[in-house]
């Protein structure tokens, strides 16, 4: 499998500084873990009964750099390692973790997690069933193992390119971060899965100023890729110029209108609205507890027949993709909404067992310190049949939203407020003036029923998304084609109240 980009055209050699990133039996080779040890830890976890137990080993190496005022202001490299032990008894979960991978400390964590149960000891399934190998991100040299000088070069190039774009660009901040996460997941049901998960991301933020007015633009990209990714088509200059373009554009933008009107969402990153206002409501834990607006609606119409929404953790190189989830289950493509009909939820092992549904491979966690829960991977709406130009031409008066900043959503009812960081007026079927201060206010399930046109131009985001839930952050992908929402409330600059919705 070849990556969808070319290597650096000058033949740059990004040499390794650490050879320890081989994913094959990482914890066996580097920490002396054996299958006998794993069986012993699981037996300790089930020593007081319990329906299920698992172990999550993690070794994370990471790098981060930040350039501000044309100089490197921060640089960090780090390593963390640990093991989390979970015991499930009915609907109760016991969890304990340790950053010491010695046998004594893992056994102590296992016995601590076991305190949730109070029944005769159970015996784990004899022997492990190892997951079939899959390689969605087969990098030869993970970014975290490349020379730091090459990473410094990237952020300095971004700073230079943004400042050269226009003299009105007065402030630039460029950042780079990468990591390599080695995991081992074993469970009392025989699960055995290993993975080595690379991740890299670059961001550029620019501030333009003139006549007492200022505006910000941001851009970036990445994925489960090697450092060479940033020396190809998706390079620092591309991100820097895009961030600068956005900032300059906003300097002359006019105030956003207010009221209910047609809204056209551009392809790609605007899919964050779908992710937040709809996607979280389709996670199984919320539906099991009946706190989601979508609870009990399987088989019912929840969207326009033009809407098909999927979550797909199997896309090569994508930020939200995983060979296996954090419970050792292979990820998959899950159809959530098909032609407007709700088909299913995103589940982990616990939700699947308690709800009597299939495990979709969406059990994710931030680190060994956290319990897994149902989470999205790459969530997007499939392309439709409409041409983007026809969608714009169909709007007499409305807003074209291209990029989004922050937002808030209440999972229980789907209400959301999102700020558009780049948007334009649509007047008489044409995109006209840029606008600033636009917020989109609505209800996720309701908005989907108002989608009347879906473009044939599906696009995924550039690989910068991070999703937060219950204090845990995980990398994700989002995407949509151009789509038209017939009626949506647009709040202009004068509107300050965001309705108090939860993030």
Say what each PLM segment does.
Residues 5-7, 11-503:
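N-terminal small-residue-enriched
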């Amino acid at each position: 499998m070849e990556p969808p980009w070319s290597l650096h055209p000058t033949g740059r050699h990004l040499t390794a500084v650490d050879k320890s990133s081989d994913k094959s039996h990482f914890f066996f080779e580097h920490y002396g873990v054996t299958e006998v040890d794993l069986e012993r830890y699981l037996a300790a976890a089930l020593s007081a009964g319990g329906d299920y137990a698992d172990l999550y080993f993690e070794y994370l190496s990471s790098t981060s750099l930040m350039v501000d005022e044309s100089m490197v202001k921060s640089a960090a490299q780090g390593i963390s390692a640990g093991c989390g032990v979970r015991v499930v008894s009915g609907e109760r979960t016991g969890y304990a973790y340790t950053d010491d991978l010695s046998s004594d400390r893992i056994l102590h964590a296992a016995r601590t997690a076991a305190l949730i149960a109070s029944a005769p000891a159970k015996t784990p399934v004899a022997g492990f069933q190892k997951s079939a190998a899959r390689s969605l991100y087969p990098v030869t040299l993970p970014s975290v193992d490349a020379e730091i000088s090459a990473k410094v070069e990237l952020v300095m190039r971004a700073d230079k390119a943004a400042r050269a774009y226009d003299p009105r660009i007065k402030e630039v901040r460029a950042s780079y971060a990468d990591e390599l996460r080695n995991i081992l997941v074993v469970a009392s049901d025989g699960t055995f899965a290993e993975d080595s998960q690379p991740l890299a991301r670059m961001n550029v933020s620019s501030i333009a100023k003139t006549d007492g007015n200022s505006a910000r633009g941001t851009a970036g990209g990445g994925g489960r890729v090697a450092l060479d990714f940033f020396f190809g088509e998706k390079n620092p200059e591309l991100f820097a110029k895009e961030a600068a373009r956005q900032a300059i554009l906003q300097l002359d933008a006019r105030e956003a209108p207010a009221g209910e009107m047609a809204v056209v969402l551009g392809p790609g990153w605007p899919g964050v609205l779908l992710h937040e206002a709809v996607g979280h409501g389709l996670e199984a834990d919320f539906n099991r507890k009946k706190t989601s607006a979508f609870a009990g609606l399987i088989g019912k119409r929840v969207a326009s027949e033009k809407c098909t929404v999927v979550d797909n953790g199997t896309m090569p190189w994508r930020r939200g993709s995983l060979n296996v989830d954090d419970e050792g289950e292979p990820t998959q493509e899950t159809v959530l909404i098909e032609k407007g009909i709700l088909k299913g939820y995103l589940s982990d092992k616990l939700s699947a067992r308690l709800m009597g549904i299939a495990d979709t491979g969406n059990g994710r966690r931030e680190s060994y310190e956290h319990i897994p829960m149902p989470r999205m991977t790459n969530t997007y709406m499939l392309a439709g049949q409409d041409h983007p130009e026809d969608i714009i031409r169909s709007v007499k008066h409305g807003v074209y939203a291209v990029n989004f900043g922050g937002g808030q959503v209440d999972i229980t009812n789907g209400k959301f407020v999102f700020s558009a960081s780049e948007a334009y007026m649509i007047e008489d079927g044409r995109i006209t003036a840029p606008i600033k201060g636009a917020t989109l206010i609505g209800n996720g399930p309701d908005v989907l029923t108002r989608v009347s046109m879906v473009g044939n131009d599906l696009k995924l985001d550039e690989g910068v998304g991070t999703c937060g839930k219950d204090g845990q952050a995980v990398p994700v992908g989002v995407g949509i084609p151009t789509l038209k929402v017939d009626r949506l409330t647009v709040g202009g600059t004068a509107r300050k109240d965001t309705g108090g919705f939860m993030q």
